[in-house]
Amino acid sequence: MARSLEKGPFVAYHLLKKIENLNVEEEKKIIVTWSRASTIVPIMVGHTIAVHNGQEHLPIYVTDRMVGHKLGEFAPTRIFRGHAKNDKKSRR
């Protein structure tokens, strides 16, 4: 279900404040956040945001094609190690 257009996108206040401060100072620092639910807005483009995946913070460089997506979409939480190589032995 989509979010109402009246409400606007969700962006954590602390994250928005950090990005605005960096834009004013014209700095490019890595911003560490746990807010995977925050929507990527146009003022984030060009910044590197380290998003927590449950174990570590993964640095993500935000491009213009990412606008409208959530930060958590770019930091996978599960690692697929593949299926069993030889399944015939386990069946017998």
UniProtKB/Swiss-Prot annotation:
InterPro entries per UniProt: Ribosomal_uS19, Ribosomal_uS19_bac-type, Ribosomal_uS19_CS, Ribosomal_uS19_SF
Cellular component per GO, a single term: chloroplast
Subcellular location: Plastid, Chloroplast
Swiss-Prot/TrEMBL keywords: Chloroplast, Plastid, Ribonucleoprotein, Ribosomal protein, RNA-binding, rRNA-binding
Record flagged with keyword Kinase: no
The keyword Ribosomal protein appears for this protein: yes
Transmembrane parts of this sequence: none
Principal cellular location given in the protein's record: plastid
PROSITE patterns on file: RIBOSOMAL_S19
A GO molecular-function annotation: rRNA binding
Pfam families, sorted: Ribosomal_S19 (PF00203)
GO BP annotations, alphabetical order: ribosomal small subunit assembly; translation
The organism's place on the tree of life at top rank: Eukaryota
PANTHER family attached to this UniProt entry: RIBOSOMAL PROTEIN S19P FAMILY MEMBER, SMALL RIBOSOMAL SUBUNIT PROTEIN US19M
Function: Protein S19 forms a complex with S13 that binds strongly to the 16S ribosomal RNA.
HAMAP family named among the record's database cross-references: Ribosomal_uS19
Family: Belongs to the universal ribosomal protein uS19 family.
Protein name, UniProt field: Small ribosomal subunit protein uS19c
Gene transcribed to yield this protein: rps19
